[in-house]
Amino acid sequence: MSASVELSSYRDQHFKGSRSEQERSLRDSCTLYVGNLSFYTTEEQIHELFSRCGDVRVIVMGLDKYKKTPCGFCFVEYYIRSEAEAAMRFVNGTRLDDRLIRVDWDAGFIEGRQYGRGKTGGQVRDEYRTDYDAGRGGYGKLLSQKIAPNTDNR
């Protein structure tokens, strides 16, 4: 196995099962986590890019759990492992919508995982960001809440 398809050190803290079960699931998986997407990247764009590596079974867009709008990640599942490995090799670190995307192994999509886990509904990493990132909704959500004018006139 080449270095580009090896497992990263990241592990989903919400995985239901032991560490060894998670490792086994990752090693056998045909599912990829895709991160650092623009909030404006479409499922069609993702399909066009990832289908160059093989037959994509399904794409599940990551959504803000409250607004149900894209929040910068998705899951891409292939029918066979070798095609997912090709995507790890050739798509990880490429540009999509002028952003370097990250591709990592995922133990397999489970309903509910398409929603952001942050307090405000999106991804945790976007809550604490202090820089302005137009492709990911501007400033970090917690910072935006602090600097937003108070519109509550009670």
Swiss-Prot record:
CDD domains associated with the record: RRM_NCBP2
Source organism of the structure: Drosophila yakuba
Signal peptide: none
Name listed for the protein in its UniProt record: Nuclear cap-binding protein subunit 2
Keyword Nucleus: yes
Positions with a binding annotation for mRNA: Y10, Y33, R102, V103, D104, W105, D106, R113, Q114, Y115, G116, R117, Q123, V124
Family of this protein: Belongs to the RRM NCBP2 family.
GO biological process: mRNA cis splicing, via spliceosome; negative regulation of viral genome replication; primary miRNA processing; regulatory ncRNA-mediated post-transcriptional gene silencing; siRNA processing
Xref: InterPro entries: NCBP2, NCBP2_RRM, Nucleotide-bd_a/b_plait_sf, RBD_domain_sf, RRM_dom
UniProt domain RRM: residue ranges: 30-108
Predominant localisation class: nucleus
Subunit structure: Component of the nuclear cap-binding complex (CBC), a heterodimer composed of Cbp80 and Cbp20 that interacts with m7GpppG-capped RNA. Interacts with Ars2.
PANTHER family in the cross-refs: 20 KD NUCLEAR CAP BINDING PROTEIN, NUCLEAR CAP-BINDING PROTEIN SUBUNIT 2
Keywords of this entry: mRNA processing, mRNA splicing, Nucleus, RNA-binding, RNA-mediated gene silencing
Molecular function in Gene Ontology: RNA cap binding
Cellular compartments annotated: Nucleus
